[in-house]
C-alpha cells in the first residue's frame, strides 16, 4: 500500500506525540523518543534558541 490519501485514515491508532515528563507539553515524540519543545530524551540541557524568543525593544538614548 502506498502513502497517499487512502492511508491517512489508518493513522489514528497510536498518537505521534504524548505529554512530556519534563515540560508538560504534548510534544514528546513516541517513535523518536524525544520532546520537540524542550529536548527531553535528546539532551540534558533545556532546548532553547534565540530565534524562538520575542525580542525586547531597546530604548534609544537620544
From Swiss-Prot:
Q: Where are the zinc fingers (C4-type)?
A: 20-38
GO MF annotation terms: rRNA binding; structural constituent of ribosome; zinc ion binding
Q: What are the record's GO terms for cellular component? A: cytosolic large ribosomal subunit
Question: What biological-process GO terms show up in the record?
Answer: translation
Protein keywords: Metal-binding, Ribonucleoprotein, Ribosomal protein, RNA-binding, rRNA-binding, Zinc, Zinc-finger
Please share the entry's free-text remark on the cofactor. Answer: Binds 1 zinc ion per subunit.
InterPro entries in UniProt: Ribosomal_eL37, Ribosomal_eL37/eL43, Ribosomal_eL37_CS, Ribosomal_zn-bd
The record lists Zn(2+) as bound by 20, 23, 35, 38
Taxonomically, the superkingdom here is: Archaea
Q: Which Pfam family name is an example for this entry? A: Ribosomal_L37e
- Cofactor(s), names only, from the UniProt record: Zn(2+)
Subunit structure, as described in the record: Part of the 50S ribosomal subunit.
Family from the record: Belongs to the eukaryotic ribosomal protein eL37 family.
What does this chain do?
Binds to the 23S rRNA.
Annotated protein name in UniProt: Large ribosomal subunit protein eL37
- The species is Pyrococcus furiosus (strain ATCC 43587 / DSM 3638 / JCM 8422 / Vc1)
